[in-house]
Each structure stands twice: as C-alpha cells, then as structure tokens.
Curated annotation (Swiss-Prot):
HAMAP family: DNApol_error_prone (MF_01902). This is Error-prone DNA polymerase. Its EC number is 2.7.7.7. It catalyses: DNA(n) + a 2'-deoxyribonucleoside 5'-triphosphate = DNA(n+1) + diphosphate. One of its GO terms (biological process) is DNA repair. InterPro entries: DNA_pol3_alpha_NTPase_dom, DNA_pol3_finger, DnaE2, DnaE2/DnaE/PolC, DNAPol_HHH, NA-bd_OB_tRNA, PHP_dom, Pol/His_phosphatase_N. It comes from Xanthomonas oryzae pv. oryzae (strain KACC10331 / KXO85). It is found in: Cytoplasm. GO terms for cellular component: cytoplasm.
Length: 1083
C-alpha cells in the first residue's frame, strides 16, 4: 500500500469504524499548487523562511527528521529553516548537519509552553542569545522529572533580567487569543517580541487572520507568517496522528480534538503559502530570519583547567606526569622506539590542545586506584603510549604493535576517545567523584537517543490503531523472530494475519516509517562531558531517570560533530569479579597478586583454555568462543588477542576466520606479495584481523597518509550505516596497482576491509581485553574456589547463571580441581558468598588445599542485604538459641522469615524445609505473647521428597546442591531412549543421537543468518546445539519456550569441537512440573 492509499478509506477498515474524519478528505487537500513536483518555482512566488518547525526530537510530536525537513525546505526554495523542538535542543546538531548538506540556513530555536498556558518560540539571534536559550531549557528541564519540563513566567523573567536578550520571541496565540500573554512577552522582550500568524486551511482562517492582525496592531507587535510545522510532507499525516495517539495513550478513534484537523502542518510550497498569507507576513518572516545570524558550529568550548598546578602550563604538567609514569612503567629504562612514540604523541596532543583532556582522565583513574577500584582503559586509547605511561591503559607499547593514528591524528577533526572500564558495582563512586570535582554545573553525562525498533514500533502503532492485545503480541513476535532470508510478509501471514486487510497494511506502513525514529532520550552508559564553564551555556542539561544524575541533550555523535570531548567511565562486571577474587585469594590463600603481577604465560592456564573450559571467564566464555578455542588452541598472550577479535562480525563477514585457521593449522601456505605487507600481516599469518593492520597496509601498500587511512576507517563504519566505499575502492586499486600489486590481492584485501564495516576490533582494544581474559583464566585454573566465589558475588554479569557457575565449579575438569559448595545457612552464611576451610598456598610444591564455598544470603530470593547484615550482626554478638531468638534479635518480618525457610537456610537450626516453615509459623503466632512464654514441644516433620526439595531450591535460591534435575528424570529418559550428555563422548562423528537437557542459553548472532545456538545442560555437563533457520521456524515454540528440550540430530566432532546439529526438537518441559529454571536468552 502506498502513502496516498494509506490515508484514504480509513473509516471502513478500522476497529469500531471510527477514525479521524479528516483522513477521508486528505486527497482533496492535495492541490496542484502543493505538489512537490512544482515546489521550487521562482517566478512570481514570494521567498520564505519557516520560523516554527518541530523535528522528530520533539518526541512523539514531530513526524520528520531534520534530514527530511531540510531536504523538503531545499526543494521548496526556503531561505532558512528554524528547528524549534519543544523545550529542547536535542535535534539541533542534526539540523546543522542537514543544513550543511542542503545549503538551507539553520535557525536555532525552541518552543515553550508555560504553566499558565502561554506558548512561544525563542529564536536565537546571536552568540549572546544561544546560552540564554540553553539556560532556559535547562531551568525548565531541571525543575521536572525526566522527560518533562516546568516553566513559569518568573523563570523566563529571571533568565532575561539585567541582560540584553540575544533572542527573538515568537508568540503563539491560542484558539482564543489572550492579549495579556502577548503584552507580557512584549514586557520581557520589547521589540524583539513578534506575533506568529499560523493558518492551516481551516474554515475560520480569514476571521483568524483579521483577529491576529488587529491584535498585533493593538499591541504594537510585528506579525509574521509561521507554520507550526510537524512534518516535512502532508503524506506523513498518518504518522503524525499515530504519534499523537501514542503520546496520549489513546486509540486513534478516541483521540478527537488531540488530532489536527488536516495535514497542513507540513512544509508547504511557497506558491501554497502565497495563496494563504498576505505578502507582508511572508516578507516579515524572511526579514526576521535574516536577523538570526547565529551559527551554532562556532560555539567555543574549553576543557577544565584546575588540574594544572600553579607554575605549570597544561603542556608542562602533562609532560611531568608522563615522565613520572615512564619511570614507573619502565624502571630499567625506556626503548628508543617508545621514547620516539611518546615524544611524537605529546607534540600532537599539544598541537590539538588536548592536554587538559588527558589530565582529566588521569585524575579520574588516580582517584579510582586510590579507592582500590579496579580500572583499565580500552578501545583505541590503548594505542597511546602516553596513556600507558599515565597508567590509564594496560597495553605495553613494547609488547604490542601500536598505531597512534588509530587514536589520534593531526588531520582528524573529532576528539580522541578514551574509554575506561571500572568495576560495575563501584562505578557510581567514580561518577559521583566527577560530579563533586567539577560540580553539576560543569559535568553531566552524554545522552543516548532511544529509537524505535521494529518490535517496539509495531506494538505502539498497533495499539494506536486499536488492535486487540493478543493480536498486537502476535504481530510484535513477527518482528522479534526470523531472519533476513524470510520475508516479513511471510512471517506475518504465518502468524495468521491477512495482508490484504487495509488496516494491517496501514499498521505495517507506519511501523516501517517509525523504525529508527527517536522515542526519547536516555543516559549514555558512562560518557561524561566536562567543561571549564557551566555546561548549560553550551547545551541544555536535564535530569536523568536515576537520582543524582544529570544528562546533556546531545549524544556522542552530536558531541563528535561539535568537537566536545567526553570521558567514558564505563562499567565492567569482570573487573568486579577479579577484584573480589584477588581479595579472597589474598585473605584466604595468602597470595598477594594484582592483574599485572599474575604469573604470565602459564602453561596449565593455556591447556585449560584450549579445552574450552572457560565458563565464567572474560570474553571467551560464549558458546561461539568456546567452539573456536580448540581450533585456535591459544598458547601465548597474542593468541588471546586474536581469539578476542576473531569471533566478531567483521572477520566473519570479511571471510578472514577460516583462512587464518587453515594457516595456523598448517593446511594452507602463507605468502606475502611484498616485505612491507609481510611486516604488517605476519603476526596474523597474512590475514588482516585488526583495524590497525588495515590502516598500516594502506599506508605502506597504497601510499595513504595517516589521515587518509583513518578516514577510510571511519568510512568503514559509515558504510555499515549505508555509506559509500566505492571512492576508496577506486583509490586503493589505482594506488596499489601503481606499486605492482596483483588485482586478485587488491580485491581480496578490499573485501576484507569491507568486512570491518560489520564491526571489527582495533588490536589495541583486543589486547586490553586479552589482559582480563588471561587474568580471569589464570584465577579459574589456579584458584577455582576463589574465582567461582568472586564470580557469584559479582552477579549479575556475564553469560552464565549462578546455577551454571556452581555446577561448573563442583564438576571441575581434567585441568582444574573440583570445588565443594555448602548451602546457605543463617548459622554460618554472610551476605556474600565466602570461602571456608582449605589450606593456604605455600609454594608451587605445596599449593595447599582449595577451600569450600559457603553460599551467602545474597542468593536467597526476596531477602535484602539490610536484613542479612542484621542477622550477621546479631550472630556475631552470640549464637542464636532458636528460631524465636533469631527473629527477635535480627528483627525479621514475615517476608524475611518465609524467604529463609523456603531457601532451606534454617536447616542448621531446625532441620528440613517443612520443619522450618512450621517453626516460622509458630514464631509469627507467638509474636504478641510476652517474652519468656513456654516453648511448644517440637513436632517431627517428614523431609520433603527429593524432587520437591530441588524445586524449592531453584525457586528460592536459583540453584540446587542436591541432585541435578536431570538425574531424577534419568529413568524416564532411558525409557524414551534419550541419551545423557556423557554418553556422547564415545560417539563417532556423524552419529545420529537423541538427547535432552535443561535449556540454559539461547543465542542468535547477527551474522548467523537466523541460526539459533542453544546450550543444554544435564547432570554431566553442557553441549551446544545448532538449530538451522528452517528448523527454528518450524519448531519455533519448542525452541523458544522449552525449559527441558529433547533434540534428535547429528553429533559432530571436528578439530576438538563438539556440537549437535539439530534435526528435530521436542518440548519435554511437562516432566519438570512447576520448576522454573534460569535461561539467559539472546544476550
């Protein structure tokens, strides 16, 4: 269905048959003088500039993007276009970019509605006016909760008191204009106040024009033409109406007066405007637009300077800290190559005036280290020798081939990225330090624009169109399922929808239009913007959803365009796990290590990695990584760098994985077309796996400069978003052919370069992550109890549930010891999981004994840490005499009592769960009685059945230390001739098998073309099941809903990798009864 068809015939095919009647006459309003084909006509048509236009950053109001609006304005021959989103400048940078492309001048502005109903637009005239608008938006947003604003006349008066306004105020009179509102605006802004005449082809246009002109004359205000634009073209009316319904949470049929009467709030042709407005009003709009000379691209920004001590410049102080770091990092002296790199980098930092930025990041890292918060830089900043010297990153330039141009380049306009990971449980301490250090006036988090995706869009659109909830769910599932090889129409028809139904067509049409349409602002994961002056002079600041957080209205792309620097303070769960593990090792095993001092290149650790015994470690814990480990067989640190990077969309799409593996296994010869190429690609056997290699390759083989190579890198990312790489293909081919390289090699390299457009890792980033991979693997191999305990205490994080972590620890492997795990018990447990028993490590010859893990009360569902701390505090004073004593001294309420009883945490005091429930019930019954009342005689209770106990374990603790559920079901599995996973070990490659297990993971990688990877677990271990897309579609319900899944398929064993190719799937969840098991799906 076309757009034109979509907005006709609405009444007859909509639930209830009641839709906005204006849609029925939309076709009649498409007059010839409003046709886009005649839009840009110069003869006899007045010029025009639109002064009141909302983009899609007026969330759920504006229907069109800045790109669409400026393209339409250009086509219509407008001289300027004001983007005036409601109490927001969130979309203004996109407006700037669209203005640059189209040549239509951007006017910066914002629309406001005061508490008393007064509506007006502020248009920025000059550099003095811009911070005034930013400040007013900030005042309004900070006075309300996230997503709202609150502004009164007193706020406006305070903003412009004692200052000369650098703005123009455009009064937007209501349906019944109130002269007092205009008079007040005139009082605040004087002759800078104008009256907007907005006509939309309604029956009373003539009368309204007369009223407004008379009012303007009465008040002595200049009247100007204005459009109250909500969309680029009239055809987007259906989208705008749908957004209105979504905003008001009403079906379209019930929106009534909330909807506009017609589709005239679009960018109309100048001919159409000439037929509606007197020439004087159009000319007044153009004249006002010409007075708005502010260019937002010229705003100035200064980084904080207070970190520079007296007597130093930023340059000299950064030099001093770098030299101190050099002495610490290289106590034996620095190599000539690294010294040269550092000097070159310091000179470039000074040239770009980034010294204060580096000093700020170093200060944040210093604070974290002083607070014993683990942190580590990542990303392209690991290419910086200066960052390594300052202690920000962990990648030693002597050990890894770095390329500074990937991080910092003289010709690159945007600032460098420095991303630092902090422990996820303690990152808030770091964020609040930044707020304290610079104040909330000068520090705020960047925004993230949350956009509609297919599933969220179709839910909102279908609800607006009145579809029943069950049909909305079915339709939404079509967007959350399937792959690019299955047409959307097929998925929708298979779900039972009739594509011939006009209503369904409209829903799908609007849904597609809303894909990637901004929905609201959220906070960036950790990108801080810090300024030497109040941030609200540069960009509006508003409240975040979280307490004690503020965000600016621009996202990271806007910041890059405006050349504002941000510090990324990110959260990483594995750092929390490692820090807690190291603390446990130090306190319980007597081994004092840091990440940097762990023994390197440890053979037993690499043997464990090669067996894919990596549950719970960093990065290489996913099923895809586990499948790669036995094939790649990492044996040294650089192998881990490759392992981290190779299981990514870029290398996969660029067909780099298999050639690398064949060469590594000696099944394919390695050759290089030149010594320069060999020098670059030899570490990865002739296959470019990293972005830095691509850049270096172009610099040596195609004579690219550092800046040109970096520009290609950025083009790769743009190509992923729909950009063009052909200009680079032609340039690369021409230059490489000129240096004698064969066409086949050039084509191969370029296809691999394009693969990086699907997401390729910088080597520096992979090396940073590989440090944590090795640390987590070493700890898992040599201190398995402490590692499992630390991992449990760092939850939630990673791929695996607490149950899987515990099962893995108890199971052990040929490469690591088994760990005993003890249940939660109020007599012994703390809030955290703890280590008990064992014997300290003395030496390699006397490694001691691994301790056991005592599960902590944090594992008990429904129990808070506050309650647990009260229990521990009371127990520390003296042991509990009985249940009543526990409840009295720990001040336990009924909820806490029940949670402990259900978790079996009272076994050390009263025995089994049934006895605990009875005892707790008795305590509750006796609460009103006086202390010292006689105790009832204990009643003997039969222990629950084993199956009941396991069910209760999973329900209350999320894991069980008893028999695995599959062990209880094993007799039934045998009756069905279903094998255990242990039975697969002796089966030859290609054998047909029938197995079943608990579903613990489902994954659908973007590069897998609809293939689903399922992890099954039984009492003996886990296996990976590969479900091809056609079977996934046919057995969709069993695949997605099963807790216990049976699989018939083909067992495969290749290069040490074992998996099951599914041929058929069956849901056996009924055998589990009410047992609910954790499964991490599609993370």
């Amino acid at each position: 269905m076309s757009w034109d068809d979509a907005i006709e015939g609405v009444d007859r095919d909509t639930p209830g048959g009641r839709m906005p009647r204006a849609w029925n006459v939309a076709a009649r309003l498409r007059a010839a003088n409003d046709d886009i084909s005649h839009a840009h006509v110069a003869d006899g048509v007045p010029t025009y500039a639109e002064l009141h236009c909302l983009s899609d950053f007026s969330f759920l109001r504006g229907a069109s993007s800045a790109e669409q609006l400026f393209a339409r304005a250009q086509h219509c021959g407008y001289s300027a276009l004001a983007i005036t989103d409601e109490c927001s400048l969130a979309g203004i940078v996109r407006g700037l970019e669209a203005s640059r492309v189209t040549g239509v001048r951007l006017i910066v502005g914002s629309e406001f509605t005061l508490i008393d109903g007064t509506r007006f637009v502020l248009l920025v005239e000059n550099a003095h006016g811009y911070p005034q608008v930013c400040g007013l938006v900030t005042t309004a947003r900070r006075a309300a909760s996230k997503g709202a604003y609150r502004l009164g006349r007193a706020d406006v008066e305070a903003q412009f008191r004692d200052v000369a306004p650098g703005v123009f105020a455009l009064w937007l009179p209501g349906v019944q204009p109130q002269a007092e509102q205009g008079a007040w605006l005139q009082q605040v802004f004087g002759e800078r106040a104008f009256l907007a005449v907005e006509l939309h082809r309604e029956q009373d246009d003539g009368a309204r024009l007369q009223v407004l002109q008379a009012l303007a004359q009465q008040l002595g205000m200049t009247a100007v033409a204005s459009g109250d634009v909500h969309m680029a073209q009239r055809r987007e009316r259906i989208v705008q109406d749908t957004l209105t319904a979504i905003r008001h949470t009403l079906p379209l049929a019930e929106c009534g007066a909330h909807l506009f009467r017609n589709g005239e709030r679009h960018l109309r042709t100048r001919r159409a405007l000439g037929n509606i407005y007197p020439d004087a009003l159009l000319q007044a709009a153009v004249a006002l637009a010409q007075r708005c000379t502010f260019d937002i691209s010229k705003i100035s920004y200064t980084y904080p300077r207070e970190l520079v001590p007296e007597g130093h410049t930023p340059t000299s102080y950064l030099r001093q800290l770098t030299e101190a770091g050099i002495r610490k990092r290289w106590p034996g002296g620095i190599t000539a190559k690294v010294r040269e790199d550092i000097e070159k980098e310091l000179a470039l930092i000074a040239l770009k005036k980034y010294e204060a930025f580096f000093l700020t990041v170093q200060d944040v890292v210093r604070f974290a280290r002083e607070q014993n918060i683990l942190c580590q830089g990542r990303g392209s900043s690991a290419n910086s020798a200066v960052c390594y010297a300052l202690g920000i990153t962990a990648v030693n330039p002597d050990e890894t081939r770095l390329l500074m141009a990937r991080f910092l380049s003289e010709k690159r306009d945007e600032p460098p990225d420095i991303d630092v990971d902090f422990e996820h449980e303690r990152r808030e301490e770091v964020l609040q330090y930044v707020y304290r250090k610079y104040g909330r006036e000068r520090a705020a988090l960047a925004a993230t624009v949350i956009c509609y995706r297919g599933k969220s869009a179709v839910r909102d659109v279908a609800k607006a169109f009145g579809l029943p909830p069950d049909q909305i769910a079915l339709l939404a599932n079509c967007y959350g399922w399937g792959n690019g090889e299955t047409p959307m129409e097929q998925r929708i028809e298979e779900a039972g929808f009739d594509l011939a139904n006009p209503l369904i067509n409209k829903i799908l049409l609007v849904t597609e239009h809303l894909r990637d349409h901004p929905r609201h602002l959220s906070q960036h994961v950790g990108g801080f913007v810090i300024s030497d002056e109040p941030l609200s002079l540069l960009v509006p600041v508003e409240n975040a959803a979280m307490a004690d957080r503020t965000i600016i209205q621009w996202d990271k792309d806007d910041l890059e365009t405006m050349k504002l620097l941000k510090v990324d303070c990110l959260a990483l769960g594995m750092l929390t796990c490692i820090r807690k593990t190291l603390d446990l090792v130090r306190g319980h095993r007597g081994r004092d290590y840091s990440i940097a001092t762990l023994p390197g290149e440890d053979l037993p650790t690499y043997k464990m990695i090669q067996r894919a015994d990596t549950v719970g470690v960093f990065q290489i814990e996913s099923r895809a990584q586990m499948a790669m480990l036995p094939r790649l067989k990492p044996a040294e640190f650089y192998d881990l760098v490759i392992e981290v990077a190779i299981v990514r969309p870029g290398p996969i799409q660029g067909d780099m994985v298999h050639p690398y593996l064949r060469r590594r296994q000696g099944r394919e010869d390695v050759s290089y077309p030149s010594p320069a190429v060999e020098d670059i690609l030899k570490p990865t056997l002739g296959v470019p796996l990293f972005q830095e290699q691509v850049m270096e390759l172009l610099m040596h083989a195609a004579d690219y400069t550092e800046s040109e190579a970096d520009n290609l890198r950025r083009s790769m990312a743009a190509w992923r978003r729909g950009g063009d790489m052909e200009q680079h293909r032609m340039r690369v081919r021409e230059r490489m052919q000129g240096k004698g390289y064969a066409s086949t090699f050039i084509d191969q390299i370029f296809e691999q370069i394009k693969g990086f457009g699907s997401y390729g890792f910088p080597q520096s980033h992979a090396a940073s992550f590989a440090k944590l991979v090795y640390a987590s693997c070493w700890l898992k191999r040599h201190e398995p109890a402490a590692f499992a305990c630390g991992l449990l205490n760092a939850q939630p994080m990673g791929f695996y549930s607490a149950s899987q972590i515990v099962q893995d620890a108890r199971r052990g492997s040929p490469e690591r010891e088994r760990v005993e795990v003890l249940p939660v018990d109020v007599v012994h447990s703390d809030w955290d999981n703890t280590l008990v028993g064992g014997r300290p490590w003395r030496s390699a010859a006397d490694p001691g004994e691994q301790p056991a893990i005592r599960l902590g009360m944090r594992q008990v569902a429904g129990l808070s840490d506050v309650v647990a701390q009260r229990i521990v505090a009371a127990r520390t004073q003296r042991a509990f005499a009985d249940i009543g004593d526990l409840c009295l001294r720990a001040a336990l309420d009924e909820k806490a009592c029940l949670a402990l009883a259900e978790a079996g945490a009272l076994q050390g005091m009263v025995g089994n769960r049934n006895a605990a429930r009875w005892a707790m019930a008795g305590v509750e019954a006796r609460r009103p009685l006086l202390p010292g009342s006689p105790e009832e005689r204990p009643v003997a209770f039969e222990a629950p059945h084993a199956g009941e106990e396991i069910l209760a374990d999973y329900r209350s603790v999320g894991l069980s230390l008893r028999q695995h559920p599959m062990a209880l079901l094993r007799p039934q599995m045998r009756q069905r001739r279903i094998l255990g996973l242990r039975d697969l070990q002796g089966r030859p490659h290609g054998s047909g098998v029938h197995v079943a297990g608990l579903v613990t993971q489902r994954q659908r990688p973007a590069t897998a073309k609809g293939t689903i990877f399922v992890t099954l677990e039984d009492e003996h271990g886990m296996i990976n099941v590969i479900v091809w897309s056609h079977l996934a579609l046919r057995r969709r319900r069993a695949l997605l809903e099963s807790r216990l899944l049976a699989v018939r398929g083909r067992w495969e064993r290749v290069d040490g990798v074992e998996h099951l190719i599914a041929g058929d799937l069956h849901d056996l969840s009924d055998l589990l009864g009410d047992m609910q098991l954790p499964s991490r799906d599609f993370h």
